[in-house]
């Protein structure tokens, strides 16, 4: 079985979905820009040797339809011989794309794959065209399709207070802002063309979604949006709506060494798991336990953790049951998370993995975990190991 390694990882800046910098950029443009950018950073790689492109995307319609992976590859001018497939496991789509590519490499069906994901939530809203089967309500509560209400349920089950949520959200913005000021995102962001408020073209090289002015006191003034009468989840403690793409260059360790490329991380273990759709945000817990078991490791072995912040009310129960609450400032989402940066659905899996790998390098860490919840009750996890 071949060992799978990451030789590079990149992302676009995260743009605001409502009137943001990428309002005139299409999902294919963001994706093609990254495909070209990651190959330009690694000239040792002959594009003709890429076996396949695995690209995550949730809302596969409008500009993201008709296999956005292939459309972006053609737009990027990549060799027509390279295959391309768009992968959908809802919020875990691009992490699933990584898993699919890894397995192809492990069994020898590929030596090099290009992996990533995109979501332009400004152009293709999350609920666009969604039509749940009426019979689904026989087995699943209707509210299970409303992500904010599942976060409310999970938070209540675990006794997560409004104060805790507001503090977690403020932490996300503060850490993401500090990471920006200190240049900690510089190596993972590929500057990308966008449009300023006045319509002029400019190059965006920072995440415009972060709100550095966020405070716990300010968040406390917001009203609950999903359960106005009894809820605690607000817009401020939910992941921001944003547009973005992320990419990884993945290959066998043997191929990376033959090309003289630096191995940034190995894939140690992968897992997915299901959970009750009504508390879909709990998925990272069973998925992480599976991945740890497959890796022969424990949570204490993880030096750095990226836990996707769909909602504060969702992240905190997962952190609690994974034994991470006492280690937040040492291990978890050290550069902030999706509450500050946004959660462009199909992009987020490889986005958090990219941030994780950069953090592992900065901290000289051995093991890192990237994990996320998935709508309708799933979780996905990947354990990375540095050489």
UniProtKB/Swiss-Prot annotation:
One of its GO terms (cellular component) is cytoplasm. Its main location: cytoplasm. It comes from the Bacteria. The active site is at 91 (acyl-thioester intermediate), 343 (proton acceptor), 373 (proton acceptor). It is found in: Cytoplasm. Its EC number is 2.3.1.16. One of its GO terms (molecular function) is acetyl-CoA C-acyltransferase activity. Belongs to the thiolase-like superfamily. Thiolase family. NCBIfam families: AcCoA-C-Actrans (TIGR01930), fadA (TIGR02445), PRK08947.1 (NF006510). Catalyzes the final step of fatty acid oxidation in which acetyl-CoA is released and the CoA ester of a fatty acid two carbons shorter is formed. Heterotetramer of two alpha chains (FadB) and two beta chains (FadA). This is 3-ketoacyl-CoA thiolase.
